[in-house]
Design a protein with these regions (language model features):
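Pan-zinc metallopeptidase signature
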Residues: 257-381
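Post-signal peptide N-terminal segment of mature Sec-exported envelope proteins
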Residues: 25-58
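Acidic/histidine-rich, surface-exposed loop or edge segments in extracytoplasmic proteins
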Residues: 53-70, 124-134, 319-320, 336
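Amphipathic alpha-helical packing elements
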Residues: 45-86
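Bacterial N-terminal signal peptides that target proteins for export
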Residues: 1-8
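Acidic/His-rich structured neighborhood in mature extracellular/periplasmic domains
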Residues: 81-249, 264
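C-terminal motif of bacterial Sec signal peptides marking the signal peptidase cleavage site
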Residues: 15-18
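Bacterial signal peptide processing site
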Residues: 20-24
């Protein structure tokens, strides 16, 4: 899921607001460079999140509103049950988050911008107060996100702006009413709404500064495990609806994973080809990359032909580049390790969370090594 979170901070040091504060990046000399758009970026973060909070009303108010559509009421009542399930069955935080609903009247809550070098899947990072450095930058205004992506492309980077249906403030806004349920995802299949809520609540269990892959993989593991448990007690119709949705997603994920591995292979191989001149190497890389992407789009067309007209991934495929595959990796690269840890802890949620907290307390290099040790070897995949 690309679920990816754009305004990660409603910080104690930033009164009232989602002040996702862009830490100064380093220039080639290692010195800090303060972005010219810094103040404007803070302002849009504050204004955007406060507008979202103002739009949110308690679920009970929506359920009592005679003008609210019956289908919406039914889903919001279901969300209340999901929220209780998250606490009782998954031991996720019991707080104000997802007890209110906001109709944003737009297709995304924020738009994230991600970027990589032309021949790498290493995400460019931006740094924020408290939450550390992350591989994306979020905007409430779609045009601003696309403008940043265009500036990054002008610098020679692969960059993309994409819509995000939800984000987490990590529990820091519970005193303001918490993160609300949003119109941007309320219409998803039942199982997917449950997974999204579980994912975002998992970020409130723990969050490690400067380790996007660890944070997102942990939350993705919780969403998958929790989603399975929710669907096990859901109606047959809900399971069937979700099964069709998830089958397409699994097939698409398998396709994009193979493309990601192909890109990683050609970029790694290029580092060893010292005999080629820089220009020859660059031209060869560009040709190889183009071939991989052309093959990807052809294979996607073949996959889509069996989906009965479903076109939900068309926009992703149309804009796909290194950055698209890199951000996808951040959400699932370490998931198998967390799944293995859950089994090791006897599928006991409190024990699992305690074990993850122990990992989180380690220095990053040591933490990564511990996680890698639980990942399957390539021959096992």
């Amino acid at each position: 899921m690309a679920v990816h979170r754009a305004v990660l901070a409603l910080l104690a040091s930033c009164a009232l607001a989602a002040c996702s504060t862009s830490g100064p990046p380093a220039d080639s000399t290692g010195h800090a460079v303060v972005p010219r758009e810094g103040v404007a970026y803070y302002a849009q973060s504050v204004a955007g999140h406060l507008a979202l909070m103002r739009a949110a009303r308690p679920l009970e108010d929506w359920l009592a509103d005679p003008a609210a559509p019956p289908a919406l009421k039914e889903r919001l009542a279901q969300v209340q049950r999901m929220r209780r399930f998250a606490v009782d069955e998954l031991h996720l935080p019991d707080n104000a988050s997802y007890t209110r609903y906001a109709d944003l009247k737009r297709r995304a809550v924020v738009w994230n911008v991600v970027a990589t070098p032309e021949f790498s899947l290493q995400l460019k990072t931006w740094c924020f107060v408290v939450v550390g450095c992350v591989g994306y930058r979020g905007y409430f205004d779609e045009a601003e996100a696309h403008a940043l992506a265009e500036r990054l492309r002008a610098q020679g980077l692969d960059a993309v702006a994409y819509p995000v249906p939800a984000y987490s403030t990590l529990g820091w806004t519970n005193w303001l009413g918490g993160d609300p349920v949003l119109s941007t995802f309320i219409g998803y299949p039942e199982g997917e709404v449950a997974r999204l809520l579980f994912h975002e609540l998992a970020h409130q269990v723990l969050y490690v500064a400067d380790d996007t892959e660890f944070n997102e993989s942990f939350a993705t593991a919780v969403e998958r495990l929790g989603g399975e448990r929710w669907l096990a007690q859901a109606s047959p119709a809900a399971r069937a609806d979700y099964a069709a949705f998830d089958e397409r997603r699994r097939a698409f994920r398998a396709l994009t994973l193979s493309v990601r591995k192909n890109l990683e292979r050609i970029y790694a191989q290029a580092l060893d080809e010292h005999a080629l001149s820089a220009i020859e190497n660059e031209n060869a890389l560009r040709a190889s990359k183009h071939a991989v992407m052309a093959d990807f789009r052809q294979r996607y067309a073949e996959l889509k032909a069996g989906w009965g007209g479903h076109s939900g991934y068309d926009a992703w495929v149309a804009r796909a580049n290194n950055a698209s595959f890199a951000v996808q990796a951040a959400y699932d690269a370490q998931v198998p390790a967390f799944m293995a840890l859950f089994e090791r802890e006897g599928r006991d949620w409190p024990r699992f969370y305690d074990a993850v907290r122990e990992w989180a307390a380690l220095p990053k290099a040591e933490r990564t090594a511990v996680v890698q040790a639980l990942l399957p070897s390539p021959s096992d995949e």
